[in-house]
A protein has these predicted regions:
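Catalytic core of pol beta-like nucleotidyltransferases
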Residues: 1-25, 33-39, 49-96
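Conserved histidines in hydrophobic membrane contexts and catalytic metal-binding motifs
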Residues: 28
């Protein structure tokens, strides 16, 4: 799966995913966004959880997306980002 496939799948399912898991998908970042992924790369997805979302929601969305994208997925909460990492993440971010 490449960057365009990931963007397509996330875009197609965005509305239903956001309702089901109480979040907003912001985009992908990291090696897939840059186009320098390897077989061992995971897909980094930046999200913003809504009030009422739980740790279980975060685990569930990760499992669901790993199944749908057929790859390891790293769900990163925008609120949990460390300030020193934000410039690097936002530089690579491809909005969905």
């Amino acid at each position: 799966m490449n960057k365009n496939d990931i963007i397509y799948k996330l875009t197609q399912e965005k509305e239903s995913i956001e309702k089901r898991y109480k979040l907003k998908i912001k985009g992908i970042f990291g090696s897939y966004a840059r186009g320098d992924e390897s077989e061992k790369s995971d897909i980094d997805i930046l999200v913003e959880f809504e009030k009422g979302a739980s740790l279980l929601d975060m685990i569930d969305i990760g499992n669901y997306l790993e199944e749908r994208l057929d790859n390891k997925v790293d769900i990163v909460s925008e609120r949990a980002l460390r300030n020193e990492l934000k410039p690097y993440i936002y530089k690579d971010l491809i909005a969905i």
